[in-house]
């Protein structure tokens, strides 16, 4: 839970992020996922000095695309966001309303915080005990759809619980260890997600699969933990794709971002890896493509590359997906994309280096979820990382402390990742 929240200038996330459009400069709206209430580190003006968000629905869901009311038939041949509105994350909304808003004195900031709370964002299944909550949300969606929600509502979730998770960093280490039966535990976790999705087979469910995992296998096999986790990551990802290949599901594999896999030396090997994962899972129809910029800050499209992008012409997510798609197609995997715009609303960011991903200063909420992306490869802009969640603790005594969270361009003090 959020216990106390102070709004500051920035908003945080992992890796790099994107562009302009709506800027609600978030700071740290900390999300406490643990049961225990903890004091939240001070934020600075999450909503100050920002452009107001466009009006958001005050209902449990906000529209992404208002068209017909299709049956949930997710497949690689159609945009799974078209004709649906996305479910507003009740947990995030409740924390903004109960902890963030009471700490705000200016009525304008209260209005902006209320608007942000009503923007749909993905619910992260980052521990197995979150899966029953997924079921509660799907049940709520089913009820609203049966009552005539128009357009119908789709559920949006992140699958994120690999054994030896976050192998190239420390801040988001997970609950399963490969050395302690982690692969089998992960498969049970996936089975539980499948059970929920099958129970609510009439609800369109959109999943992002394992942020950072495959990208780490492209660039970080020189890290011992990643090298040791390679076979487990591939086995677990294959299992997830096969088991969640259901008629009412659309999946997007996480694919890092422009500053990670967009480099000339990385993009070809990345395409080969993603294509092999897709084909090894028997080319599941529910895999629509890839998710980029998850929990990061890169612009969707920017006229001048920021200095910290180090001379890479592929310095925004639009350039990245348009460079990546032909490589993927050549490798046997045609893909569409979704891009996280949750924290890319201020450009350039306060990053000193493109690889600085933890609690970056001078960032802000980006474009609200929409299918109006202006690019046929991009199915939607979405908010994957809820604004204000920490990327990692700045407490050097913590077992999950990562040095990036102590850099000068990182907001400090900061709590554990995901809080």
Residue ranges and their predicted role:
Residues 52-77:
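Fungal extracellular Ser/Thr-rich, low-complexity intrinsically disordered regions
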Residues 80-199, 386-402, 406-409:
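N-terminal carbohydrate-binding/catalytic regions of secreted carbohydrate-active enzymes
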Residues 85-87, 123-125, 154-159, 204-210, ...:
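Structural recognition of the beta-strand scaffold that forms the well-ordered cores
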Residues 101-111, 247, 261-406:
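Surface-exposed substrate-engagement region within the catalytic domains
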Residues 134-137, 189, 193, 233-236, ...:
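Stable alpha-helical elements in mature extracytoplasmic
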Residues 142-254, 269-276, 284-286:
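Substrate-binding cleft of extracellular glycoside hydrolase catalytic domains
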